[in-house]
């Protein structure tokens, strides 16, 4: 990733138009943050694409635009039904750049606060134990029958969708292209879908 960003910045500083392509949304567990971080470290001035930075050395100015995409949590949620209608937290289980101790703290806090929890990067060939540990942490605060949505390769031809219980999460087939949606205490499985109510039925009369 670092090599890609540095190559793109070098081309852009040479006067060329350059794009860095990420899957999903470039600002969610993707490359946009690294671009900003690299520019800050190198002291490169960043401005919006249609601005005119007067009084600045143009060789040290990059016109940068972040184009939004559809993140995996939005695509996966749409395929499952409506699991993110209420408050939620997204947590990556990859400890390559974040210490596992910090990830555990975030899992504990999100589970204790009854957020719907969206897990990115749940498992890889070299990281095969983190999802099981996350399940153990969340089970301290959630019923074992809490619905869990499993979406692999969302919106692609080979996509796969499944809904299991939190108790059986460790048996689910997941990989780095899978997003895991762990329901809150109010989330439900209805037919082949999963949803989290916003609370309308408690405040308003909805006739059966």
Language-model features, listed with the residues they occupy:
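Glycine-rich beta-strand-to-loop/alpha-helix junction loops that act as flexible
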Residues: 22-25
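Short phosphate-binding loop-to-helix
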Residues: 1-16, 27
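Short beta->alpha junction loops
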Residues: 1, 93-95, 153
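Alpha-helical scaffold segments in soluble metabolic enzymes
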Residues: 7-10, 34, 75, 79, ...
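Class I SAM-dependent methyltransferase SAM-binding "motif I" and its flanking Rossmann-like core
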Residues: 6, 28-113
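Short, solvent-exposed polar/charged micro-motifs at secondary-structure junctions
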Residues: 6-7, 75-77, 157-164
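A contiguous loop/helix-start segment that scaffolds small-molecule binding in enzyme catalytic cores
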Residues: 17-18, 112-208
């Amino acid at each position: 990733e670092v090599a890609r960003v540095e190559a793109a910045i070098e081309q852009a500083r040479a006067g060329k138009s350059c794009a860095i392509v990420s899957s999903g949304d470039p600002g969610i567990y993707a490359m946009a943050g690294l671009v900003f971080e690299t520019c800050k470290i190198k002291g490169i001035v960043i401005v919006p694409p249609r601005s005119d930075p007067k009084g600045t050395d143009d060789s040290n100015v990059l016109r940068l635009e972040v184009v939004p995409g559809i993140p995996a949590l939005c695509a996966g949620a749409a395929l499952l039904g409506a699991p993110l209608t209420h408050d939620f937290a997204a947590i990556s289980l990859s400890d390559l750049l974040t210490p596992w101790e910090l990830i555990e703290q975030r899992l504990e806090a999100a589970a204790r606060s009854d957020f719907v929890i969206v897990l990115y990067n749940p498992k890889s060939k070299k990281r095969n134990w983190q999802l099981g540990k996350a399940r153990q942490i969340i089970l301290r605060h959630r019923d074992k029958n809490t619905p869990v949505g499993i979406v692999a390769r969302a919106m692609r031809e080979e996509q796969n969708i499944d809904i299991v219980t939190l108790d059986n999460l460790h048996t689910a087939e997941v990989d780095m292209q899978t997003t895991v949606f762990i329901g809150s205490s109010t989330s439900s499985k209805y037919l082949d879908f999963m949803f989290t109510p916003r609370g309308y039925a408690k405040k308003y009369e909805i006739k059966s």
